[in-house]
Amino acid sequence: MGFGLTGLNPQADTPEPKWDGGDPMTKVAGTEHQYEVDPQIKEEYDDFMKSRMEWQEANEGAYFRNNVWFWRPLWNFVTGCCDNILTERDVEQGYFNDGHKICKTKAKRIASRLRKYLKNGHISAYEAWYSKEISQLKEGDWNKNYPFSIQNVREFERFCEHSGGFEIW
């Protein structure tokens, strides 16, 4: 399970690729709930998906991905340092990938706060503290699987800055 955040109005250098070929999925014969990309359009759809992923990578505010292991520590940190930016509902809904929206103003303020903390060394200190805490957990403790990294914070800051607000999926 992962979290895919989509920019609501990302600042982009090029237009986002759009699929106009209708529903690409078709039911697999002999199954009740299994679907696949229609074999007749698979190559075309794969090309579209590749171009869309390239566009997302080239435009920082378009899409941000984290698996659940990386997302939770990041969101914990963000909610702690942005407690006067995010509402209680934002904080709670950020732990679920069900489409909660963070508006452009909040996204910009989150980015600004993260930049400040990146610059003043607060995030480096937090990463060191977090790593020490994780290393002291007992073997087999699932919390050892939740890493925190400055690079992840940096990428999230850039996403927030350029997203125009975002949805958490």
Q: What function would you assign to each model-found segment?
A:
Residues 1-169:
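Acidic (Asp/Glu-rich) sequence patches and key acidic residues
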